[in-house]
Each structure stands twice: as structure tokens, then as C-alpha cells.
């Protein structure tokens, strides 16, 4: 086992604090509407320009192992806040730095670290309750657009597009962010259920101009197997042909004789049909076929439940108002499924979302919920260069997380004002002893830090503006974008309550751990350098002429 370096008490805490400060100083320049950019080197390709706090934090690794531990712990603050609320990473980092700096001073002055931590925890818990009582529900499109604008660093167009997308697909809908092809940002909304499988043969196409299959009021046959024998399909085809309606077939695959016969009958006009493959793979394919069946009021023909294709009749088929198929996608619009069955299916998938630990599975399950309950919106980000595209896409994703958080837990006055308002309400909070009360004071002082940093980044004098905001009441605060004071709700400077709450809780939690650290252990770098070196290359003489 390699030898270790061990640092104790003041020496350990000082090194850790240095790491905290290096990381926080790099991250906090991005805070607020006038935050600066940070340029990140990439081992391949061009550097990345970002104003996203968590992206900056993730890039930082320090040479000194003890300083690096401090930096990594603050990185955890940013990551945790990002995971919970999707934004607020820079605010959380600024709060953590302030609590750690002031807390370390208290410990150095001889205060009890555990009592300081208890005081900090007490202040954070009280502040969280105040945030909840201060928050206002965020339901109208205007407020949602304002939250999106703030999170996208003051880009109004992004805020409006997100509000528009949320209105169109609802709270359950999925909104994805893609890179666009032009200079303009665009919003594309897919109504109904769309999946990424197109028609199996171009001979099914009904609209030659758009090369699309369009089936009006069709029957839908869902089959959980490969169809290659036409005899299996004949009973259903004959029944559908008699009814005079079109038929859409969604199966694992259709090939050979079955596909050829289907194409010939369609071209002759005997039956109007089109076929596509079922979406997904393995168990996910079965689940998605079941989703489609419930949405359209049909039954999946599956031998697993003792139902063969020869036994299928019109009662087993689903139906929809319209089905369209392109070369890549199939869309089912206005399925004839029973509302109660669809809701039950959505609840079932939601329960699976709660249970799953895989981010990939969770994302796929959420997509299924959206396809059943809401819809899917795609925001295509436009920009002049690839640099700008990547930076803008990251901002749009941040803004999207923020607006979701705002709809979930409401909004509070933005620009660091909410924490200053709460600080005023908690001035009389006292601990069980003097050290705990000092811990409370540390947390309350830290609550000014985000506003101070926003003002500093905007090039103004922090103390003057903080005192002016403290003297005000309610939603009165400072708008760093315009340099004006006033009602922040009227100005559209809003923060999601969930983001402010998560930032404070994450910062308080990790900073409390740092203050109560008494020893740090790391690998000894000298030990590694001494052993494991490459052998002497003495036998390489005679190669001097290669210089």
C-alpha cells in the first residue's frame, strides 16, 4: 500500500479553503446578466466558450491534492444543485464559498466547529421555509417567458420560445433542444404520438409531392412478431377491405411475400394499406406497442398471450383520426383509446420512472409519458458559428430546466433579492449557545453574496446596492441588466423558488462538512515518482546522428 500524506486541523482547512476559492473564483464570474465568459480548452478541436457555472466547475482539477479535495467538494455543490433544479449552480458555488470562508475564520478564532455547523443548518432550514412562503405560483406564459429569459442570460427570444413550447405540449410534454440549420431559433411541435420508424416500401406513398403516406380514419393492426407469410394476414385484410377503411400495420417487421402482396393490393386499390416497423428494441418495443394499442383502443396481437394473427378480427384493431408516415417517422394523431385507460398507463409508467436508477431509462420512460399524455416540442437553436451554437444550446437547456422548476415550485424575486429579503426576516434567529448563533450569522451573511457578486460582475459598487435593496421591501430590488431599482416582478426579474432553495441547501450541506474537517489524507506524490519509473535506456548508444 502506498504511503499517504496527512494534514491536520488548521493546515488542512487552509489548503481546502484555497481549493474552494480557486474553483469558486473561476465560476462566479459567470453570475448574473452581465456575467463574463469562461473559455475551456478541449484536448480535441476548438475551445468551448461558456457562461454555465457547472460546465466551468467540471473542468477544474488542481495539482495539490488537498486543494483539489476542497475544489471537488464545491464541485459537488454545483452538480447536486444542477441535478435537483437544473440551474442555480453558480449561486450555490458563491453561497458555499462565503459560508466556508466565514466559517473557517470562526474555527480559527476558537469556536466549536460542530456548533457552527448546527447554527448554519438551523439558518438554512429557516430560510427554506421562508423561500416557500415567499414564492408565487408561476402559471401564465408571460412569467414562464421571464424566467426563461433570465436563465438564458437575458435572451428574450429564448424565453418566449420556451413559454410557447410549454403552452403547446403542457407540463407532461417533452421539450428537447437540437442544433438548427439556420441563424434563427425555431420551435417545432409534434402533435399526437410520433416514433422514429418510416414506411417499409415507397409504394405505400399516397402523396407523391411530399412523399408521405396519409391514412384518414384508418384501422391499426399492432403485431408483436415478424410477418412473412401472407396467409396469416388474409383474414384481417379481407375484413378491412369490406369495411372500406385504410389499414396501418405496425409490426416487428414485414418482409418477403407478405410485403409484396400488401404492396400489390394497395397499388390495385383493393385495400389501402401501409406498414411500418414497431419502435424500440426488445422489451422496450413490446412496451411501446402496448402504448400504441392503448392510445388507439386496440389490442397487440401477440402469441405470448395466446392470440395469433389468423384469429385477429376488426375488434382487435385500433383506430385513429389520422396516421402519417414519412421515410423516417410515423405519427398517430387523435387515437381512439379510452381516456381512463391512457391515464392508467401514464400512472404505471410514472411509477417506473420513480423506481428506475438509470438516467437513460428515465429519459426514455419520460418520452413515453409525453407521447401518451402531452406532446413533443423540439427547439432548434440557430447561430452563425459552431462556437455560438454550442454556447447558446447550453443556455437554452439551462433556461428550460429553470422554467420547469418555476412551474413546479413557483417563483421568487430574482437577482439575489429573495435571499436578502429572507435574511431580513431571520435577523432575530438565535441558537442554543453563542457559537451556534455565530453559525446562523455566517449563513445569513452568505445570503448577501449572490447579490454582491451579480453587482460586482455588472461593474457597480456592491455594498451601496446591497444596503439600498435591504432598505426596501417585498419585490423591490436591483435589476443589474438595466442598472435600475424597482419591483422585480414588474421588470420580469424572477428566479424559480426551487433553484434558490436547492442552491442554499446544497451550499449549506457541503460547507458544513468542510468547516468540521479536522484531518485530510491523500496519496504521497513523491512515493509514486520514486517507484514505477522506466528503466535506464543505456543500450541506445550510437543513435547520436539522429538529432
From Swiss-Prot:
Highest taxon listed in the record's lineage: Bacteria
Annotated stretches, region: Disordered: 525-547
Report biased composition (Gly residues) as residue ranges. 531-547
Q: What is its EC number?
A: 5.6.1.7
Q: What GO cellular component term, any one, is given? A: cytoplasm
UniProt keyword annotation of Cytoplasm present: yes
As recorded in UniProt, coiled-coil segments are none
What's a GO biological-process term for it? protein refolding
Q: Give the first-level EC class, as a single word.
A: isomerase
- Name the UniProt key words of this record, in alphabetical order: ATP-binding, Chaperone, Cytoplasm, Isomerase, Nucleotide-binding
Q: Which positions does UniProt annotate for ATP binding?
A: 30-33, 51, 87-91, 415, 495
Asked if the keyword Cell membrane belongs to this entry, the reply reads no
Instruction: Please give the PROSITE patterns that the UniProt record associates with this protein.
Output: CHAPERONINS_CPN60 (PS00296)
What is the protein's quaternary organization?
Forms a cylinder of 14 subunits composed of two heptameric rings stacked back-to-back. Interacts with the co-chaperonin GroES.
For this entry, the protein name equals: Chaperonin GroEL
Q: What is the protein's species of origin?
A: Chromohalobacter salexigens (strain ATCC BAA-138 / DSM 3043 / CIP 106854 / NCIMB 13768 / 1H11)
Amino acid at each position: 500500500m502506498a504511503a499517504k500524506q496527512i494534514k491536520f486541523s488548521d493546515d488542512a482547512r487552509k489548503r481546502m479553503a484555497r481549493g474552494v476559492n480557486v474553483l469558486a473564483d473561476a465560476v462566479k464570474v459567470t453570475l448574473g446578466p452581465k456575467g463574463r465568459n469562461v473559455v475551456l480548452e478541449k484536448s480535441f478541436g476548438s475551445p468551448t466558450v461558456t457562461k454555465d457555472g457547472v460546465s466551468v466547475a467540471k473542468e477544474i482539477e488542481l495539482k495539490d491534492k488537498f486543494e483539489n479535495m476542497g475544489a471537488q467538494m464545491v464541485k459537488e455543490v454545483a452538480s447536486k444543485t444542477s441535478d435537483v433544479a437544473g440551474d442555480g449552480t453558480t449561486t450555490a458555488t458563491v453561497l458555499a464559498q462565503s459560508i466556508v470562508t466565514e466559517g473557517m475564520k470562526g474555527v480559527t478564532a476558537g469556536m466549536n466547529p460542530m456548533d457552527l455547523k448546527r447554527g448554519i443548518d438551523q439558518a438554512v432550514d429557516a430560510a427554506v421555509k421562508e423561500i416557500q412562503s415567499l414564492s408565487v405560483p408561476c402559471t401564465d406564459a408571460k412569467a414562464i417567458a421571464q424566467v426563461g429569459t433570465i436563465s438564458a442570460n437575458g435572451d428574450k427570444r429564448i424565453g418566449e420560445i420556451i413559454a410557447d413550447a410549454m403552452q403547446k405540449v403542457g407540463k407532461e410534454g417533452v421539450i428537447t433542444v437540437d442544433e438548427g440549420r439556420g441563424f434563427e431559433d425555431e420551435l417545432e411541435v409534434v402533435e399526437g404520438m410520433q416514433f422514429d420508424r418510416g414506411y417499409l416500401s415507397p409504394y405505400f406513398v399516397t402523396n407523391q409531392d411530399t412523399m408521405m403516406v396519409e391514412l384518414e380514419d384508418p384501422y391499426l393492426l399492432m403485431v408483436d412478431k415478424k410477418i412473412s407469410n401472407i396467409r396469416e394476414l388474409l383474414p384481417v385484410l379481407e375484413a378491412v377491405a369490406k369495411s372500406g377503411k385504410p389499414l396501418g400495420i405496425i409490426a416487428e417487421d414485414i418482409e418477403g411475400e407478405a410485403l409484396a402482396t400488401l404492396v400489390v393490393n394497395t397499388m390495385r386499390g383493393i385495400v389501402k394499406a401501409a406498414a411500418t416497423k414497431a419502435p424500440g428494441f426488445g422489451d422496450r418495443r413490446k412496451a411501446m406497442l402496448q402504448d400504441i394499442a392503448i392510445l388507439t383502443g386496440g389490442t397487440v396481437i401477440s402469441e405470448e398471450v395466446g392470440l395469433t394473427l389468423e384469429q385477429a378480427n376488426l375488434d382487435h384493431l385500433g383506430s385513429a383520426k389520422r396516421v402519417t408516415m414519412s421515410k423516417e417517422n410515423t405519427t398517430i394523431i387523435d387515437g381512439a383509446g379510452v381516456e381512463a385507460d391512457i391515464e392508467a398507463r401514464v400512472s404505471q409508467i410514472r411509477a417506473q420512472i420513480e423506481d428506475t436508477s438509470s438516467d437513460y431509462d428515465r429519459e426514455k420512460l419520460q418520452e413515453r409519458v409525453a407521447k401518451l399524455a402531452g406532446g413533443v416540442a423540439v427547439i432548434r437553436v440557430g447561430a452563425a458559428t459552431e462556437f455560438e451554437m454550442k454556447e447558446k444550446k447550453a443556455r437554452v437547456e439551462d433556461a428550460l430546466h429553470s422554467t420547469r422548476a418555476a412551474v413546479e415550485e413557483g417563483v421568487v424575486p430574482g437577482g439575489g433579492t429573495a435571499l436578502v429579503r429572507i435574511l431580513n426576516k431571520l435577523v432575530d434567529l438565535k441558537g442554543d449557545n453563542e457559537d451556534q448563533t455565530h453559525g446562523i450569522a455566517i449563513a445569513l451573511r452568505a445570503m448577501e453574496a449572490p447579490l454582491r457578486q451579480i453587482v460586482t460582475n455588472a461593474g457597480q459598487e456592491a455594498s451601496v446596492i446591497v444596503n439600498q435593496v435591504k432598505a426596501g421591501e417585498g419585490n423591490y430590488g436591483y435589476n443589474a441588466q438595466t442598472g435600475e431599482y424597482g419591483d422585480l416582478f414588474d421588470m420580469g426579474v424572477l428566479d424559480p423558488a426551487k433553484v434558490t432553495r436547492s442552491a442554499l441547501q446544497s451550499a449549506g450541506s457541503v460547507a458544513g462538512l468542510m468547516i468540521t474537517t479536522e484531518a485530510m489524507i491523500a496519496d504521497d506524490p513523491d512515493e509514486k515518482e520514486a517507484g514505477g519509473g522506466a528503466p535506464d535506456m543505456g543500450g541506445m548508444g550510437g543513435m547520436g546522428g539522429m538529432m
